[in-house]
């Protein structure tokens, strides 16, 4: 007894192919910046006496950035693969989702950058490369969607 022969009417599985060309310039900047931000969270953000700590270790609230970054990357990747898009009937548009998410990430990363860990006895804490990479990546991810809004509010 074996398995039945495949029927001639069987539908072939659709091929899932990541199409980078389907992404516009804004999506590439938002997605690329967010991917670099995600990676930077695991890099050394602060150093003290030769020891370094990651952004996630120094500031637990950066786990929010980690989760939001995964959501942004997932949304853009799902659209590039063609498996899912934000429904047109949604009350919030795709761009609104990305604006809120990238702005939240930027604000939290800026706060983490400015609030170096320390306190009593830790006056020598300095920034390390991960903090700069993370801040620049958060700016790159938020800028393409945020700048037009800023310009419109200024009346330009």
Which role fits each region the language model picked out?
Residues 1-156:
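Compact integral membrane and secretory-pathway proteins
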């Amino acid at each position: 007894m074996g398995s039945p022969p495949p029927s001639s009417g069987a539908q072939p599985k659709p091929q899932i192919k990541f199409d980078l060309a389907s992404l516009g310039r804004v999506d590439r900047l938002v997605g690329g910046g967010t991917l670099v931000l995600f990676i930077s969270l695991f890099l050394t953000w602060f150093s003290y006496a030769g020891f370094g700590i990651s952004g996630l270790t120094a500031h637990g609230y950066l786990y929010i950035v980690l989760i939001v970054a995964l959501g942004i990357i997932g949304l853009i990747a799902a659209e590039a693969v063609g498996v899912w898009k934000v429904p047109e009937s949604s009350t919030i548009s795709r761009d609104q989702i990305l604006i809120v998410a990238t702005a939240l990430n930027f604000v939290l990363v800026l706060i983490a950058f400015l609030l170096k860990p320390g306190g009593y006895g830790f006056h020598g804490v300095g920034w390390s490369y991960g903090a700069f990479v993370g801040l620049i990546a958060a700016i790159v991810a938020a800028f393409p969607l945020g700048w037009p809004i800023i310009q419109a509010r200024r009346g330009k």
